[in-house]
């Protein structure tokens, strides 16, 4: 849970580092360095992570944008100080009409909805985030208007290995516990680890674990080379 929260905070500020202005990087990077928390607001109740169907709207009004919409399943949603929000600025363009914005938690119109009662990762805060007539300065646009989808794809390519590493650690721990239990649990005078059926299960777990680890290391090497596809 803690790993998810830390990763999500990095995830939230990454678009600024990838495509933000120097002013944005200095202002919001400094706030995170001081201990503030960020969150990435992509997922929506009706469209999930399909950015082409994003219903959250950002309408230009002078030197501001007016933001309306609801995001769901947002990691750090209830505790973040800074949100990066994906919103449609040109609905007729689908995913090509998405833009990213920096939104401060204390901006009027920003509220936190329900917190998810999750089966696992319960120490990681996950909530709805609601934007109702939220006015944000045009200077909070990350990159160019309608370039949010492209920025998000770069973001996901760089951050997915982090999630994979976390899942790999959980899987390794599960295998370690399974092996330990199989060696201790005795049936008919022998540890169940000596039973062929159990050996098969443990071997399959190890194969899948090593395959995932090899994939993660390969992805990390590609990123080190500047290859993100």
How should each PLM-predicted stretch be described?
Residues 203-226:
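Active-site pocket-lining segment
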């Amino acid at each position: 849970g803690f790993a998810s929260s830390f990763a999500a905070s990095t995830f939230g500020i990454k678009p600024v580092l990838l495509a933000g202005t120097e002013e944005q990087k200095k202002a919001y990077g400094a706030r995170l360095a001081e201990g503030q928390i960020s969150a990435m607001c992509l997922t929506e109740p009706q469209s999930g992570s399909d950015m082409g169907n994003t219903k959250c709207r950002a309408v230009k009004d002078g030197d501001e944008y007016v933001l309306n919409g609801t995001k769901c399943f947002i990691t750090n949603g209830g505790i973040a100080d800074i949100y990066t929000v994906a919103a449609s600025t040109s609905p007729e363009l689908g995913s090509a009409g998405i833009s990213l914005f920096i939104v401060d938690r204390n901006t009027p119109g920003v509220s936190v909805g329900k917190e998810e009662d999750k089966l696992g990762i319960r120490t990681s805060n996950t909530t709805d985030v609601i934007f109702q007539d939220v006015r944000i300065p045009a200077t909070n646009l990350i990159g160019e208007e309608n370039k949010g989808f492209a920025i998000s794809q770069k973001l996901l390519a760089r951050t997915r290995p982090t999630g994979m590493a976390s899942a790999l650690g959980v899987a390794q721990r599960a295998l370690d516990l399974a092996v330990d239990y199989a060696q201790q649990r005795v049936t008919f005078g022998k540890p169940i680890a000596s039973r062929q059926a159990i050996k098969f299960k443990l071997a399959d777990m190890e194969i899948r674990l090593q395959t995932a680890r090899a994939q993660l290391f390969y992805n990390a090497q590609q990123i080190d080379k500047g290859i993100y596809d």
